[in-house]
């Protein structure tokens, strides 16, 4: 036995030679007796399912999204048009027309690239085969709670390709504690049911991308493992490379089998708040004392900041902390507007899964009708706007407001209707709705 035998591990479960009864060696890999038994059980179950398939009823059909995602045949007639994509986004997300247009066009062009790649081998394309369509990754910039992540999540519901959402804050440079950038591809692979070919046609949304900006404009002497190091690691993935993805996630090690994924046809959408970026843009124009910094008439500070960001240039992102190579790989930039009080009121009631509709459905299950007076909705929107966390503040306010009612109603049979008023919103409590049972003369009509 060589001196290295004590360090041998199973390539599948990771157990060492001392922890198992038998370790079988192959060309560069090892498997223990426990994993062999597990593989035999899986094969026996599959053979049993296959032999009994004729006697079993037909399996349930997959959800439409899954069924479409497995289809690899794309034609131009089946591709949703940009207007159709935006119309669906309008049903779930309030405002943000510019960002919706950018996303709709990008997704539509992504579909067309996939359709062309599938028909590239046919001779009827003629001279067009020499024209290669390259992808245009997207960067969404906007304050917290304005709908960046919701746009991506809503987009995922209507796509015929796998869609994964990742968080940049958990990523670190290779060799350090944290997640490798390849774990982003693992999420996409899991959405595609481990179908590599399907995953290579997908779309990835990387949230909180501004959190990997380097800490200073000048290169640092010490390593920035969660900032510039992550940007460097993402470069080839964004542009297109063959990445080795560990199937179980985590760090890669020499004895691990990896899945190879070509990222050339994966569309990347990056989003972040980029707090303070508007100041960089303002300073470039020599407007340190004017523009959005000073209070003006008719516009909020956040709205003026969004207007300044519409004059954004790549150099501004470099000064913020993004490296030039990264910026060059996300050529499409869309600014997401902050939400004002009117937009927050619309978010409460208009979307298909609006917050008010959710609570009405919850109370309906207890046979109680829930109503919000217009001035109550306005008060909720005003408080959410004051908290400066965008639409995320709405749920916190309504949850706090409805706590007493939702605690008591399941045990009460004498309340059939609840009407929330502005006074209740200001008190942050709906407890008074439970004082007078509905069997008494209606107190709200008095």
From Swiss-Prot:
GO terms for cellular component: HslUV protease complex. SUPFAM superfamilies: Glucocorticoid receptor-like (DNA-binding domain), P-loop containing nucleoside triphosphate hydrolases. Coiled coil: none annotated. Residues 53-76 are annotated as: Disordered. ATP binds at residues 143-150. Keywords: ATP-binding, Chaperone, Metal-binding, Nucleotide-binding, Zinc. Residues 1-51 form the ClpX-type ZB domain. Disulfide bonds: none annotated. GO terms for molecular function: ATP binding; ATP hydrolysis activity; ATP-dependent protein folding chaperone; protein dimerization activity; unfolded protein binding; zinc ion binding. It holds the Pfam family zf-C4_ClpX. Zn(2+) binds at residues 10, 13, 32, 35. It comes from the Bacteria. One of its GO terms (biological process) is proteolysis involved in protein catabolic process. ATP-dependent specificity component of the Clp protease. It directs the protease to specific substrates. Can perform chaperone functions in the absence of ClpP. Belongs to the ClpX chaperone family. Component of the ClpX-ClpP complex. Forms a hexameric ring that, in the presence of ATP, binds to fourteen ClpP subunits assembled into a disk-like structure with a central cavity, resembling the structure of eukaryotic proteasomes. This is ATP-dependent Clp protease ATP-binding subunit ClpX. It comes from Trichormus variabilis (strain ATCC 29413 / PCC 7937).
